[in-house]
Amino acid sequence: MMVFQSFILGNLVSLCMKIINSVVVVGLYYGFLTTFSIGPSYLFLLRARVMDEGEEGTEKKVSATTGFIAGQLMMFISIYYAPLHLALGRPHTITVLALPYLLFHFFWNNHKHFFDYGSTTRNEMRNLRIQCVFLNNLIFQLFNHFILPSSMLARLVNIYMFRCNNKMLFVTSSFVGWLIGHILFMKWVGLVLVWIQQNNSIRSNVVIRSNKYKFLVSELRNSMARIFSILLFITCVYYLGRIPSPIFTKKLKGTSETGGTKQDQEVSTEEAPFPSLFSEEGEDLDKIDEMEEIRVNGKDKINKDDEFHVRTYYNYKTVSENLYGNKENSNLEFFKIKKKEDHFLWFEKPFVTLVFDYKRWNRPNRYIKNDKIENIVRNEMSQYFFYTCQSDGKERISFTYPPNLSTFFEMIQKRIPSFTKEKKTFDQVSTYWSLIHEEKRENLKKEFLNRIEALDKEWSVENILEKTTRFCYNEAKKEYLPKIYDPFLHGISRGRIKKLPPFQIITETYRKNNLGGSWINKIHGLLLKINYKKFEQTIEKFNRKSLSIEKKLSFFSEPQQEEKINSEEEIKTFKFLFDIVRTDSNDQTLIKNFMDFPEINKKVPRWSYKLISELEELEGENEENVPMEPGIRSRKAKRVVVFTDKEPHGEIYTNLKDNQNSDQNDEMALIRYSQQSDFRREIIKGSMRSQRRKTVIWEFFQAKVHSPLFFDRIDKLFFFSFDIWGLKKKIIKNFIWKKKIDKKEEEQSKREETRRIEIAETWDSFLFAQIIRGSLLVTQSILRKYIILPLLIIIKNSVRMLLFQFPEWSQDLKDWKREMHVKCTYNGVQLSETEFPRNWLTDGIQIKILFPFYLKPWHKSKFQASQKARLKKTKDKGEKNDFCFLTVWGMETELPFGSAQRKPSFFEPISKELKKRIKKLKKKSFVVLKIFKERAPIFLKVAKETKNWILKNFIFIKGISKRNLIPLFGPREIYELNEPKKDSIISNQMIHELSVQNKSLEWTNSSLSEKKIKNLIDRKKTIRNQIEEISKEKQNLTNSCTKLRYDSKIIESSKKIWQTFKRKNTRLIRKSIFFFKFCIEQMSIAIFLGIINIPRITTQLFFESTKKILDKYIYKNEENGEKKKNTLYFISTIKNLISNKKKMSYDLCSLSQAYVFYKLSQIKVSNFCKLKAVLEYNICITSFFVKNKIKVFFQEHGIFHYELKNKTFLNSEVNQWKNWLRSQYQYNLPQISWARLVTQNWKNKINKDSLVLNPSLTKEDSYEKKKFDNYKKQKFFEADSLLNPKHNVKKDSIYNLFCYKSIHSTEKNFDMSIGIALDNCLVSSFLEKYNIRGMGEIRHRKYLDWRILNFWFTKKVTIEPWVDTKSKKKYINTKVQNYQKIDKITQTDLANKKRNFFDWMGMNEEILNQRITNFEFFFFPEFFLFSSTYKMKPWVIPIKLLLLNFNENINVNKKIIRKKKGFIPSNEKESLRFYNLNKEEKESAGQVELESDKETKRNPEAARLNQEKNIEENFAESTIKKRKNKKQYKSNTEAELDLFLTRYSRFQLRWNCFFNQKILNNVKVYCLLVRLNNPNEIAVSSIERGEMSLDILMIEKNFTFAKLMKKGILIIEPVRLSVQNDGQLIIYRTIGISLVHKNKHKISKRYKKKSYINKKFFEKSITKYQNKTVNKKKNNYDFFVPEKILSPKRRREFRILICFNLKKKNARDTNSRFDKNIQNLTTVLHKKKDLDLDKDKNNLINLKSFLWPNFKLEDLACMNRYWFNTTNGNHFSMIRIRMYTRFPIP
């Protein structure tokens, strides 16, 4: 059941796949997509559906739809039917028919209303309205102008047409698919229209409620047809505008018009591409370029100047009689063109040639030429032409077949039937093809084996290597063509015939000596099956001695017989098939032999114009034979005339007298370039601009324009990333540091400069902008000088006269006359007051105002100021310029196009004077005010008392009149106890009066209120006394009155409280104003003080935090040698670690052991002193001879484990290392520190991306073993270090040395060199383990990034700045001592090994000298290496793109082992001394390869003496050699210049930006001085003002580049050439990304076994000069390869021929040869017993893998087209390219 279900499911899937891939479904899909290519034809269709109504409207809809579908059907049929496709595919045919029809249709509908039909059904046939609608839709569908520019939608059917077999079914299904899409589209349009008509909301918005607009709406509806016509016309004109109009296109003068000669045009070419049938340029598709004239008389001369003729001689009588047997066809007339009179010549050219000149520049073509004489051959667009050809012995369709060749072949077949090819069967063709190439392969194989045998016999290299075949044009002198022109070296397509030197007169002698005939093979392979051997290596043909091919074959190749063609038929056939370029017209023998041969003249497409650029026009305006109008746009440049000397005299005349042009002597001009990007550069005028449809430009000036598709290539986008650390740092910096004024001014000046440049470029970019601007400037200058300023002077003096002041006519007129308006160039170079710049209307102008006039209200008196005042004035105004530039708006600016300056105000001095006078008046009135102030208090006091008395009486009288109360001061009665009401009334009355009096305080002044308060107090006292008397009188009353007395006491107390509250309230109101003022002042002071203290507090916190952070890592050495920490502890104690509840499992192996020992070396080892005797004999120690106390001590510290018998100190396991490390209290790290050091993300990244598969402590010697051992699988477990005892001995010996040094140290402070040396040794060991030093030798590793290596690989003493010593002197001594010890210790058994060390550190030395701020990477270098390596992931970059500077330092005979206080080379001494003086200076850049030997350890003293002697001898010898070879330079600048000039062949000079402004200022002053008669005074004044700089004046006449570079004026740099990437480079870069070697991330089975190479075999072939001693640069890519015996051309041929099985007839398609299923073939070299190689098989495999790097991509690239005559591009698909192995030799 399951099998049945799977069977059904598989059938369904296969059925679905077949349906999807069927021709019908694909045709429906492509046809449906074609619907979206909407064009102008839809306008007619939509108009008929929208506006036509009624019965006639329905008929019009039907006719429009029918015409639309019929037009599209014709377009689909034209794909299959060739004549219809040619008729519709000719752009000129459609264009010529479309333009008149469009004009007719536009004017026909322009005078009629759409709804005014005026006809009935009976005259419809007469009006032809329905038929016109049908024709409109049909014709416009054929026009095929797309709304989408360059739309691919309509071309999809054409593209897929050639991929299917059943073409008719595909065309039919495509049309059906288009029809379905069209019906759906029209239905959707109809639904939208119905929805609009039915939707009331839309209709209500359209209703016009005003009668005023109804007429306009009706007119709009009536003119709808006209609107449609206008839209259609504009659309078609726009798409015709994509092709330059034949009428308005810029006419270019031909060669005959510019004075060209026939000799200028006769230059040969090999290819003649022609216009394509599918071209969009509007070029002629008739075979104009293929027109060939047959001249019966061979003596006729060719008079056309702009044609290049290829003449072919053949005996038409003999050929027709012998080959064809038909005398009537003897003329072989391909095209007959009758000669006419000269005045009828314009009738000869077709109409298309007159209207559409195909030679016109219709595309943005670049005009590339070699010399000024010749015209460029027209290079057409790449064309797709399908034709059958042979490929690999089979007939195949090629889509890049030359159309002219196919036309010529069809022409030959029609005229010469016997030349028709005989169709052979597939087996015959394949067999014939296989036999040819098999025989060719055998010859190459035999020759190659002979050469290898000669190599075994140790023959001379000159006889073994194959000679390169070169093209020789002078056999006697052995003169060859240059390599770039040699077709044997660079392929046939690149061959060029040597051109004449420019402006050389061709004489008869030159013709005889230098020009000869040549045979060019054209089309023989197409027409005849010529024997391959017969014509392959024919040296001489027809005994022509003027041309020969020098081909030196070595004695190994079999001599091939030179066959001469003897039979007449072969001669005639050969002459017919080979074109002869007759360049020697004096060769009479040649003419006699072929006198009866007529000529076939073939015109090569060549531009008939001689174009020059605009820059060439500016450079040579007055030269002869140069066209006046440039045809090529250059970079925007303007010729600015700086100086015009009408009377040449003196030195200027003597310097310029050699120039022939007298007018040029009078001018000094500069060329000014525009600073904006110019896309028109090198484009021919009248051509179209490139269609940048995918670029987005959002700024006015944008440097790097690219498509939005590549936004992901940008490093950081501001809206996708937010750098919080950078923002935080910026905020802290802004809080701590104040912004400097200089920086602000600099930024402001930069912004101003950018703004000025933008304004200048804007004026320069628009058309007629300079004319408008120049006119405005001149107008503003005239208005200012002669109208505005005189008018202001008149108004000012008139006002002064009205104000009875003296006028200042003379002073104002003097200042007005002093103002000068100097005309300047566009850059601001001043000329004179009357002289205008040349072409100032087009180039631009500036007007500079010297001593500008400012209107002043009055002039100061002319008394002489003191010297001090004058100096102060000049100092204040020293920076102020006494000139300005005029703007378009009449304003003044300091620089051209700068911001407007503020003029001195006319009224500002008046306001200042008024203020001064007011101040004087105040001073005079001060005395009067003082007297008044003294007498004022008396007067105020009298007035106050009078006022108070009046108010008092008034209030008293008013109170009496209002109420009839008992007077307080009059007679009164004592109330009885039964009358308590009156007392309450009295009290109430007093309270009421008090409240009334308090209210009165609001409107009385302070004096009145005080008086009133005083009166009230008196009254209160009186009332209080009266109350007391009354209370005393009532004390004698009965007990019944006690309650009343108690109540009265309460009332009295409440009265007192209320009165006190009132009194305090009054005082508080009076004093509240001052209280509020005081509070506000205190608050403002507190806020201000807080703001002031914020920077101080933040600064203090910042420094405290940084101090705390730094104190974690810095330790001080006290006098007693004990270690103490400053503030915070870097490593916590054991108690803190135990107290943590949550423990982590730490990987102690990730710690750098170098850092551990470095820290331990700083700890005083006092307890080890008593154990010296034990440790001196630690090799023989066992647990029986050691005391238990010492055992316990060692076990506690993890030094020895005596339980492990026969285990010495050197053979400790990883667990012992961990336990000992944990016993040290410094490494009981807290949780935070471990989290920072051992990051989980980092560990994951290392496990994921690490190239080294074993991250344990095992370190393999990468130089002792092959580099492929890194790919050997190793298990990861703890005791893995015991697997490689050799390496462990080497590693642990370093530790042993460290322990020995630390224990036997007699000094209190431990020598720090041990820790440094140990770290350096471990780093070098780490490099060896991960094979970083041998990265260049690993061929499978296609990348190398120098940034993965840290600073200490070149600087051995870089760790020393962190070592503290007691004094500076001791520090210096320790440094030199440490340097020696490092060199001594790091020589660890690397002798007798050739080192390859890339000098990647030289790429960027600045990074090496930077100080390290990240302490993690300093103490843990292994972290830094891998983390920085795999952040960049550079393995997709090919190695040759990165290793551009591949340097290798080889030190073979130099063995450097230095004693402790012994010999140091002088260059290193100098570097050490310089390093001690300034730490930031660079050290000596050379990499010293250290070597050591095992004998050094056994007998160090003897080895040291021998090594020292060898060092001194080698060093002295090397220094002598260096002095002989090295060129002596006086300074580094000369050496750098010489090095630069030898390295770069082209360079340019750029002056320093610091001197740029100074030089320009000097130029401006010079331009002014050369016009003056007496320039001395102006020169002195300009020097005083600082306008002229004397320090950059060139006193010497001849300056060398070195002197200029020393002065800092010129900076030399390579030329930024525009790189034109060739096809090979593009293919290499494209495929280099996909060619990621599989060994990057997985283990290859090929490298499981270790391999060794016996180097004895190679030492024989190494010459003597290769055994160098010092600094030998070597390229591993040039290593000897046996295949290089052959030449590169034959090498490729040999590789390709041996990869195919030619004997197999039923071979598969060529694409299958690159399938993945094919197994890798064996190697090329068979293992031969007589070869002196190692017997191990792996050595040979590794050798060949290492020596054969350059045979992969280029073989595939040239395989099809070059070797097997294959033009089918499908055979070379980059997707199937793979890295294949060598091919065998059968």
Curated annotation (Swiss-Prot):
It is a multi-pass membrane protein. Residues 1007-1046 form a coiled coil. The keyword Protein transport applies. Its main location: plastid. Pfam families: Ycf1. The chain crosses the membrane at residues 19-39, 68-88, 91-111, 133-153, 176-196, 227-247. Involved in protein precursor import into chloroplasts. May be part of an intermediate translocation complex acting as a protein-conducting channel at the inner envelope. This is Protein TIC 214. It comes from Arabidopsis thaliana (Mouse-ear cress). The gene is TIC214.
